Swiss-Prot record:
GO terms for molecular function: 4-alpha-glucanotransferase activity; carbohydrate binding. The active site is at residues 123, 214. homodimer. Inhibited by p-chloromercuribenzoic acid, monoiodoacetic acid, mercury and nickel ions. CDD domains: GH57N_TLGT_like. The keyword Glycosyltransferase applies. This is 4-alpha-glucanotransferase. It comes from Thermococcus litoralis (strain ATCC 51850 / DSM 5473 / JCM 8560 / NS-C). Its EC number is 2.4.1.25. PANTHER family: ALPHA-AMYLASE-RELATED, ALPHA-AMYLASE-RELATED-RELATED.
Length: 659
C-alpha cells in the first residue's frame, strides 16, 4: 500500500516580559486543552517545542501541567525539540551564548524526562555557520521551511525528505516544513489536510510530510478557540490522522532511526517566505507585495516563487535603528560579562528575539517587550565598572560617546544632533529614551493582497489572510517622523507655530541641528558639544548651539548657549523624548519652570527643572502597527519640548532628575 510518513509538531512560546494575563489566556485557550485532548488519543504523536520563558511561567503558575507533559513523554506521545532557552534568533547572538542557551533548554527537557537531539530554529532564521554551533551543542537535526530548500534550487517535489547540510566539516540533518500544511492546519476542515496528505502517498517508504508551526494557532489566534475546540476540529484531526492507514505518524527521531536523509544540500541565509517581505524596508516591502500579487494574477507565482526572494531577518537591524542599537548594546555587554555567570544570566534573557523585529505580531512596536530587553541589558551592565568611552556602539562607522557613573549610562550620538540616545538608570533598570519614532510601514497602504478570502471558503482565516482597514479616528492622528527620537534635540521654530502642527509634523523646522553632526570634547562626568549651523529664514542666518551635558547622581544637567549671528525672532526648542508607556497622555501646552512625569508601570517618576520658565509642548508619540488582532495604535513615548524665545542670544540650563 502506498503511504506517507507524517511528522506533526507545534512550537509554544511567549516572550519574556509579556503580560501575565497573556500567558494565562494562552495557557487556557491553547497549551492546556491541546495536551488534554492529546492524552485522549494514545496513538497520536506530537513533536513539541516550549520556550524557556513559557516553561518558567508554567513551572511557577501551573506545575501540574509539567506532570501531564512528563506522562505524555513516558507514553511515547511527545518528542521534545529544543532551541535557545530564552528564544533568541541563534544567528543573531554570539556562538558562546548559543551553546549556553541550547544547553539550558536541553537541561529542562531532561527534567521532563527527554534527551532532546533536535532544534526548532527560532523564526527559522538559518545561516550556514549555525551547523558548527548546533553540532557542538549535541544537536542532530534542525527544522526549517521548505522555502529554504527552494531558495537553494530544489523543486517542491524534492522536499518530502530530510537532507544533510554541512559547514566547516560538520554535518547536520535538516527537515523541511511543508508550507501548504501550515496554511491548511488548523484553518481548513480536517478532510482538506487528509486529502492533501493522501495525495502525497508513495511506494517510497522514506517519503515524509512535516508540519511544525505555532501552537498558538490552536486556540489563541483570532477565531481559533471556537473552531479548534468548541467545534471539535482538533479531536476530529487526531482521530482522522491516527485511523488512516495511508498516514504513518512519526516523530523526528523515529524517522531518523529508520531512514537516512536523502543527500547533501547547502541552504542560503533564509527564514520563511513571509519574513522575506517583513524584513524589507517599507518601500521595498510594498514593491515586493506588488510583485508577488502580479505573479499570482498572471498564474506564474507557484512556478517562479523559488526565485522570489526578499530580505533576510538581520535586515531588521537596518530597518529599525532602535533594534540595531539595542542589539549591539546587548552584544557589547555579552562580550564584557562572559566570565561572570550572574551578569550573563541577564544578558541571555536580553537575547529573547521578539522585541528586535516586527511582522504580523507587534514585536518591536510593543514597549513592554523592549523594556524587558533593556532591563536585562542594564542589569548585566551593573556588574561592570563604570567608565567613559568613545566607541562605535551600533557599528554604523560613527563614534558614540558613552558617559557612565554609578547610577546612569548615557550614550550620545555627536553625529545625530549631539543628542542622548540612551539614558539608562541602573537603579530602575530602565532606558528613559526607549522610544520608537512614527514610521510608515508598507501595510499602511492596504494592498489587495490583504483582502480576506471569499466567505464561501470553508474554515476560518489565518492571521495572514485577515483584511484590515485603518479606522478613521486613527487615520486623523497618523503622522510620520522625519527624525529619530532622542533626549536633548535642538529645534528652531517660527514664533507663531502651533502644537498641533508640531506634533502632526506639519510645521517648518528652521534650523539644521536636530539630525546633523556636532563637534565635541570630553569633560569630567560628561561632554561638551557644539555646532556651527544655520537658521533658514528668507536667508541663512549662521547660528551656534553649545550644550554641556554632565551626568549627576540622579540624572543629568545640560547647560545651553545659543547664538545667532544677526537678530531673528524665533523659538528655540529642546525636545526630550521619554519612554512613558503606562499612562496615556494627551497633547498639552503649558508654561513651567519645572514639571514632573509620572509613569508608574514604566519609567516611574522624574522631574525636569529649568533655570527659567518656558512654554512646554507635550504630546504622545503614537505608532500604527499591525498585530494578530488587527491594528495597534500604541503610545511609544511622550515628547516634551521646552520653548524659549530667541532673537540673538540665549542661555539656560535643563536638569533631569530621577525621583
Amino acid at each position: 500500500m502506498e503511504r506517507i510518513n507524517f511528522i506533526f509538531g507545534i512550537h509554544n512560546h511567549q516572550p519574556l516580559g509579556n503580560f501575565g494575563w497573556v500567558f494565562e489566556e494562552a495557557y487556557n485557550r491553547s497549551y492546556r486543552p491541546f495536551m488534554e485532548i492529546l492524552e485522549e488519543f494514545p496513538e497520536m504523536k506530537v513533536n513539541v517545542h516550549f520556550s524557556g520563558p513559557l516553561l518558567e511561567w508554567i513551572e511557577e503558575n501551573k506545575p501540574d501541567y509539567l506532570d501531564l507533559l512528563r506522562s505524555l513523554i513516558k507514553r511515547g506521545q511527545l518528542e521534545i525539540v529544543v532551541a535557545g532557552f530564552y528564544e533568541p534568533v541563534l544567528a543573531a547572538i554570539p556562538k558562546e551564548d548559543r551553546l549556553v542557551q541550547i544547553e539550558m533548554l536541553k537541561d529542562y527537557a531532561r527534567k521532563l524526562g527527554y534527551d532532546a537531539k533536535g532544534v526548532w530554529l527560532t523564526e527559522r532564521v538559518w545561516q550556514p555557520e549555525l551547523v558548527k554551533s548546533l553540532r557542538e551543542a549535541g544537536i542532530e537535526y534542525v527544522v526549517v521551511d521548505d522555502y529554504h530548500f527552494m531558495s537553494a534550487g530544489l523543486s517542491k517535489e524534492e522536499l518530502f525528505w530530510p537532507y544533510y547540510t554541512e559547514d566547516g566539516g560538520e554535518v547536520i540533518t535538516v527537515f523541511p516544513i511543508d508550507e501548504k500544511l501550515r496554511y491548511l492546519i488548523p484553518f481548513r476542515p480536517v478532510k482538506k489536510t487528509i486529502e492533501y496528505l493522501e495525495s502525497l502517498t508513495s511506494d517510497d517508504p522514506s517519503k515524509v510530510a512535516v508540519f511544525h508551526d505555532d501552537g498558538e494557532k490552536f486556540g489563541v489566534w483570532p477565531g481559533t478557540y471556537e473552531w479548534v475546540y468548541e467545534k471539535g476540529w482538533l479531536r476530529e484531526f487526531f482521530d482522522a490522522i491516527t485511523s488512516n492507514e495511508k498516514i504513518n505518524l512519526m516523530t523526528y527521531s523515529e524517522y531518523l532511526s529508520k531512514f537516512t536523509p536523502r543527500g547533501l544540500v547547502y541552504l542560503p541565509i533564509a527564514s520563511y517566505f513571509e519574513m522575506s517581505e517583513w524584513s524589507l524596508p517599507a518601500k521595498q516591502a510594498k514593491l515586493f507585495v506588488e510583485f508577488v500579487e502580479q505573479l499570482k494574477e498572471e498564474g506564474k507565482f507557484e512556478k517562479y516563487r523559488v526565485f522570489v526572494r526578499g530580505g533576510i531577518w538581520k535586515n531588521f537591524f537596518f530597518k529599525y535603528p532602535e533594534s540595531n542599537f539595542m542589539h549591539k548594546r546587548m552584544l557589547m555587554v555579552s562580550k564584557a560579562v562572559r566570565d561572570n555567570p550572574e551578569a550573563r544570566k541577564y544578558i541571555l534573557k536580553a537575547q529573547c528575539n521578539d522585541a528586535y523585529w516586527h511582522g504580523v505580531f507587534g514585536g518591536i512596536y510593543l514597549p513592554h517587550l523592549r523594556r524587558t530587553v533593556w532591563e536585562n541589558i542594564i542589569k548585566a551592565q551593573r556588574y561592570l565598572k563604570p567608565e567613559n568611552k568613545i566607541l562605535d556602539v551600533d557599528f554604523d562607522g560613527r563614534a558614540e560617546i558613552m558617559v557612565e557613573n554609578d547610577g546612569f549610562i548615557a550614550t550620545i550620538k555627536p553625529h545625530y544632533g549631539g543628542s542622548i540616545f540612551e539614558l539608562s538608570s541602573k537603579r530602575k533598570a530602565v532606558n528613559y529614551n526607549d522610544v520608537l519614532p512614527r514610521r510608515w510601514e508598507h501595510y499602511h497602504e492596504v494592498p489587495e493582497a490583504t483582502k480576506p478570502e471569499k466567505e464561501s471558503e470553508e474554515g476560518i482565516a489565518s492571521i495572514h489572510e485577515l483584511g484590515k482597514q485603518i479606522p478613521e479616528e486613527i487615520r486623523r492622528e497618523l503622522a510620520y517622523d522625519w527624525q529619530l527620537r532622542a533626549i536633548l534635540q535642538d529645534h528652531f521654530i517660527k514664533p507663531e507655530e502651533t502644537l498641533d502642527n508640531y506634533r502632526l509634523v506639519k510645521y517648518h523646522e528652521l534650523g539644521d541641528f536636530v539630525n546633523q553632526p556636532y563637534e565635541y570634547e570630553m569633560i569630567e562626568n560628561g561632554v561638551k558639544l557644539w555646532r556651527e549651523g544655520g537658521v533658514y529664514a528668507e536667508e541663512k542666518i549662521p547660528a551656534r548651539v553649545e550644550k554641556k551635558i554632565e551626568l549627576t547622581e540622579d540624572g543629568f544637567i545640560a547647560k545651553y548657549r545659543v547664538l545667532l549671528e544677526k537678530p531673528y525672532k524665533a523659538l528655540f526648542g529642546v525636545e526630550i523624548n521619554l519612554a512613558v508607556h503606562s499612562v496615556m497622555e494627551k497633547p498639552e501646552e503649558f508654561e513651567a519652570k519645572e514639571f514632573e512625569v509620572n509613569d508608574p508601570y514604566g519609567i516611574g517618576k522624574v522631574r525636569i527643572e529649568l533655570d527659567k520658565a518656558a512654554k512646554v509642548w507635550k504630546f504622545p508619540i503614537k505608532t500604527l502597527s499591525q498585530s494578530e488582532a488587527g491594528w495597534d495604535f500604541i503610545q511609544q513615548g511622550v515628547s516634551y519640548t521646552m520653548l524659549f524665545p530667541i532673537e540673538k542670544e540665549l542661555e539656560f540650563t535643563v536638569r533631569f532628575r530621577e525621583l
